[in-house]
Design a protein with these regions (language model features):
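Class I S-adenosyl-L-methionine-dependent methyltransferase module
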Residues: 48, 52-248
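S-adenosyl-L-methionine
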Residues: 1-48
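Long, positively charged, glycine-interspersed low-complexity recognition regions
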Residues: 12-15, 277-278, 284-346
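Short, hydrophobic beta-strand segments that form beta-sheet elements in well-ordered domains
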Residues: 33, 54-56, 304-309
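Conserved SAM/SAH-binding loop
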Residues: 254-259
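Active-site regions of enzymes building and remodeling cell-envelope glycoconjugates
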Residues: 32, 51-54, 71-75, 267-269, ...
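Glycine-rich phosphate-binding loop signature in dinucleotide/nucleotide-binding domains
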Residues: 25-27, 263-268
Length: 346
């Protein structure tokens, strides 16, 4: 069962739990998403119909929010087709490029390693520009069968099927857990540009349990970056447009949370997903004590204030919801389990 994705690909996104959170907020004329990040909560709120207007604010991610909510489908398509080389990634000041083309959207490390860079570049060109011959000359896999598809997303899916079909004669199931594997020798040869990889008869030797790569791990051969990054953007863009969501429904601002121009308290709900206390990885220093006092002050003024956090000890914050989640930043090997909580300021 596929999970609905909200917002742009962004480290720390609330996409998986956006529905849970938005469903608990009272309906008002305005929703203030004070730390919008990739816009997952704002996106979900737009589709919920509970709010007439949403202000998506973030001190750092205005460029990402504008791309996600305000770009046309044509702009998204152009961005999908553009290959960003490592050199350009390292030089650019574009936060959007840094996010979409970085490993686990961390905006630091380029998405592809040296070992698979050329393979990924040629796969991208085959899918986006129909340069099948260059890809086949590099790794010996013919993708011309995807030519009948015009939709870019369908072409990616067809390319994945074609690559898996090419690998099938050289894969086998492990007796113990029935996981499907291919020999690592073949995996490395394809990424490295050895188009004669089919002549590497190492399957029998690797059946003994050495030098295996599971088909799940070998998705590096099948996938371009779009699985978690740009691919979701075009789908979300089309969904937004289909609901006639326009600039009249959402405003994007880029100020500190305590500088947001707030509407009347009786008409406004504030949702905050700030940098969590005692966690690392944020680009700026954040004063959690100051933030919590601001929330208390706003609640005293009559605003409905909700905060996402792992744990808030201040008694003014009442826990109203919690859920165990799995964070997969950095891939399946780096899964971390945590309990997300939503607090309401009394």
């Amino acid at each position: 069962m596929s999970v609905r994705k909200y917002g742009a690909a962004y480290q720390g996104s609330k996409s998986k739990i956006a529905n849970d959170i938005i469903s608990l907020l009272p309906a008002r004329k305005y929703l203030i998403d004070a730390f919008s990040g990739g816009g997952a909560l704002a996106h979900c709120a737009l589709e919920s119909g509970k709010f007439e207007h949403i202000i998506a604010n973030d001190l750092q991610t205005k460029e990402i929010l504008e791309a996600h909510f305000l770009w046309t489908p044509e702009q998204h398509l152009d961005f999908q087709k553009k290959w960003i080389a490592k050199e350009e990634f390292e030089k650019t000041d574009s936060l959007y490029i840094k996010t979409c083309w970085s490993f686990s959207n961390n905006r630091k490390a380029y998405i592809y390693s040296k070992d698979c860079y050329e393979y990924k570049r040629l796969l991208h060109n085959a899918i986006c520009f129909r340069n099948y011959k260059e890809f086949e000359d590099y790794c010996g896999i013919d993708l011309s069968e995807i030519d009948s598809y015009d939709n870019l997303n369908e072409r990616r899916k067809a390319a994945r099927r074609a690559i898996l079909k090419a690998l099938k004669p050289y894969s086998f199931k492990e007796p113990i857990n029935s996981n499907t594997h291919i020999p690592k020798e073949i995996y490395d040869a394809i990424l490295g540009g050895n188009k004669d990889w089919r002549n590497l008869q190492s399957i029998e030797a690797t059946k003994q349990g050495k030098g295996l790569v599971s088909i799940i791990s070998s998705e590096n051969l099948e996938r371009t970056k779009y699985s978690k990054n740009v691919e979701s953007l075009i789908q979300q863009e089309n969904l937004l447009r289909s609901k006639s969501i326009t600039a009249s429904n959402i405003s994007i601002t880029s100020v500190s949370y305590d500088e947001i121009d707030l509407p009347d308290p009786s008409e406004t709900v504030i949702i905050c997903d700030p940098p969590y206390r005692n966690t690392q990885g944020y680009q700026i220093e954040f004063d959690n004590d100051k933030f919590e006092q601001w929330c208390i002050d706003k609640a005293k003024e009559g605003y409905e204030v909700f905060v996402c956090e792992y744990n808030i000890k201040n008694p003014a914050f009442e826990e109203v919801w919690s859920k165990k989640v799995i964070n997969t930043g950095g891939g399946n090997k780096n899964q971390k389990r945590s309990i997300e909580k939503l607090y309401h300021v009394k």
